[in-house]
Amino acid sequence: MYRKSALELRDAVVNREISVTAITEYFYHRIESYDEQIGSFLSLCKERALLRASRIDDKLAKGDPIGILAGIPIGVKDNIHITGVKTTCASKMLENFVAPFDATVVRRIEMEDGILLGKLNMDEFAMGSTTRYSAFQHTNNPWDLERVPGGSSGGSAAAVSARFCPIALGSDTGGSIRQPAAFCGVVGFKPSYGAVSRYGLVAFGSSLDQIGPLTTVVEDVALAMDAFAGRDIKDATTRDFFRGTFSQALSLEVPKLIGVPRGFLDGLQEDCKENFFEALAVMERQGSRIIDIDLSVLKHAVPVYYIVASAEAATNLARFDGVRYGHRCAQADNMQEMYARSRKEGFGKEVTRRILLGNYVLSAERQNIFYKKGTAVRATLIEAFQSAFECCDVIAMPVCASPAIRDTDVLDPVSLYLQDIYTVAVNLAYLPAISVPSGLSKEGLPLGVQFIGKRGADQQICQVGYSFQEHSQIKQLYPKAVNGLFDGGME
C-alpha cells in the first residue's frame, strides 16, 4: 500500500477497494514499526484519526458525498494547530501548549475528509536546516540514518520519504520545505506568499512564512493545494490567485523559456552541478529553451534574509514570556527575573541566537544601518526577479549545494546559514517554487532541482515540476537505510 500515491489511495477508497480505517491502521503500523529509527513524528492522534476514518467509511456506506482527500493520511508539522493536540514547535517553551483551535489548512483538510495522523518533528520554532535544533529528538534521514533530513520541516520530509504518510504539511520561511524535500528524495512545494492561509501557523517570519505540502509525486501536491489553497477571511494576506484546479493545470503546455542564473552556480558540489545540468537537458528535450539570466543581486540574499527573518522572529517570539504564553520558570524574585529565566529555560541556543540578532538589528542605534538597508535591498531583489521574468517564464536553480550532510559534518551556525543561498530569495520575493527529485549523487543520496515562478503562478510551477517528473522518469524514490521499511512484507 505504501507504493500508492495519495491520488491512488483516494481512488481505491472511492472504488470501495479498501476502507479508510484499513488505510489508517496500515500507516500507523508502519510508523509504530519503523519510526523509532527515524524520529519523524513527535506525537500521534491515533484515536482521533481512527474515529474520523470510521465516520468516512460510514459516509461511503450510505452513498454520501466524500471529499477530495478521502482516506488520505496526512502528517502535520508541529507549528500548525490541531484543536486539542499539543503544538510544541519542538520547543521546551511550548512543551505543554494544547492548541485551542484548528489552523485553516487543518480545517480545510478535514472538510475534504483527510486523516490527520499526528505532529511531525522540526527545528525549534522552524529555525534551522537540520532538524537537530528540536528540543525533543533528532530526526534521521531515511536514506542514511547518520545524515540529517534537512530542516526545518525535516520530520515532514522524512515521514513522506519513509512512506509513513503520502502527504505532509510543512512551512517554508527560507527553504524549510524545499531543502529537506531535496535531502530526502521527495517533492516539496512552497506556494506564493498569500496563496495558503497562515491562520493557525505559529509565526517565525510573518512576511516570509508559507505553509505547503511535501509528497512523493507532484500530482499529490496539486491535490493538496486544491484542498486548502485560496483566500481566507482569517488571514488578510491571502489572495485568490488561481483559476481552475491545480490538478487540471498539470496538463497545460510546458513554458518555453527557462532562465538559469549560471553565474550563481559556482558553489555547487561537482556531482550536484552535473545533476543540475542533466535536469536542464530534460527540460530542453521537452521543447523548452534554456537562457542565461542576470540575478547577481542574489549574492546579497542570505544576509538580507537573516536580517529580515531575525527581526521578525524577535518580534513574534516576544509573546512567549511565561505570562501570556509558554514555559514559566519555577521560581523568581521579581517579574523581570521571571521573564528572563522563563525565556532562558524555554528557548534553545539557535532560537536565542536569532532573537539576539533580531533585537540587535532593530535597536535604535542599528536599525538604519541594518534593518532599513536590508529591506531596501529586499526591494531591489524583488525588482531583479521581475526583470528576469520579463525574459523567461520560469527560473531553474539547484535547491542545495550538496546532498544531505552527516551529523559529524554539521557546520557552525554561520556556515549553515550560507547553505540557504539557493532558497531564501524565493521567500524574500514572495514567489512560488517547487523542489522535485532529480536523481542521486555519487554516494547514492537524493538530489533535487528547483523551479521558480512569478508570484501567483503556482499552478504553472506545479505543471513544470510534473512535466520534469514524467520526462525524467525519476519518480517514487525509495530509501534503503532502514531494514524492512520497503522489503519487510508490509505491502
UniProtKB/Swiss-Prot annotation:
Question: Where does the record place the catalytic residues?
Answer: 77, 152, 176
Q: What is its EC number?
A: 6.3.5.7
**InterPro entries for the chain:** Amidase, Amidase_CS, Amidase_dom, AS_sf, GatA
Keywords attached to this entry: ATP-binding, Ligase, Nucleotide-binding, Protein biosynthesis
List the disulfide bonds in this chain: none
Gene Ontology CC annotation, any one: glutamyl-tRNA(Gln) amidotransferase complex
Extract the Pfam families matched here.
Amidase (PF01425)
Main EC class the enzyme belongs to: ligase
Which one of the record's GO molecular function terms can you name? glutaminyl-tRNA synthase (glutamine-hydrolyzing) activity
The protein's annotated catalytic reaction(s) are:
L-glutamyl-tRNA(Gln) + L-glutamine + ATP + H2O = L-glutaminyl-tRNA(Gln) + L-glutamate + ADP + phosphate + H(+)
Q: Which NCBIfam families match?
A: gatA
Purpose of the protein: Allows the formation of correctly charged Gln-tRNA(Gln) through the transamidation of misacylated Glu-tRNA(Gln) in organisms which lack glutaminyl-tRNA synthetase. The reaction takes place in the presence of glutamine and ATP through an activated gamma-phospho-Glu-tRNA(Gln).
User: Subunit structure, per the record?
Assistant: Heterotrimer of A, B and C subunits.
What is the name of this protein? Glutamyl-tRNA(Gln) amidotransferase subunit A
Q: Which organism is it from?
A: Chlamydia muridarum (strain MoPn / Nigg)
**Gene that this polypeptide is encoded by:** gatA
